[in-house]
Regions:
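Interfacial loop at the N-terminal end of multi-pass membrane proteins
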Residues: 1-33, 86-97
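Juxtamembrane boundary at the C-terminal end of a transmembrane helix
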Residues: 120-131
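Membrane-helix exit/interface motif
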Residues: 32-49, 75-78
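Individual transmembrane alpha-helices with interfacial aromatic-anchor signatures
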Residues: 25-28, 95-114
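Lipid-exposed faces of alpha-helical membrane segments in multi-pass integral membrane proteins
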Residues: 30-37, 41, 61-64, 68, ...
Length: 131
């Protein structure tokens, strides 16, 4: 990154994340609550009506991947976001932001994308679009 932009980012990121943080946290918690709850509901509903479908297991796999988003990287993400809001380390917020972006990229490909694929395959399977 251009040093001029780095200096600006180090100044602007902490207040931006302080303002965005609570709203963004609500969005993330809400979306993962919906993913986990709907995945579990679809798994349990199929069981209650006696359907033994492959889709049920895809729903559970999606739930597991969605839960991994929070369980594996949740504390690290919260710590990095706190560092960004606090201007750490030593006013070099872009260092913390870079770490958060790298962690987020890894998490997106390791668990978020597989969760999304599992939920899509589950839905298509239950609708008999695929076997």
């Amino acid at each position: 990154m251009d040093p001029t932009y780095t200096a600006q980012a180090n100044t602007l990121l902490p207040p931006w994340f302080k303002n965005w943080g609570p709203w963004g946290t609500n969005i993330v918690v809400g979306s993962f609550t919906i993913s986990l709850a709907s995945g579990m509901a679809n798994f349990l509903t199929g069981r209650e009506i006696g359907e033994v479908t492959v889709g049920r297991y895809w729903y559970m796999a999606g739930v597991a991947f969605a839960a991994a988003h929070l369980l594996i990287w949740g504390q690290k993400a919260l710590g990095l976001l706190a560092m960004i809001r606090g201007g750490e380390p030593s006013g070099e917020t872009t260092v913390s932001m870079g770490r958060w972006l790298e962690m987020h990229r890894l998490r997106s490909f390791a668990v978020d994308l597989p969760a999304m694929v599992c939920f899509i395959v589950a839905a298509l399977s239950v609708m008999d679009v695929i076997v």
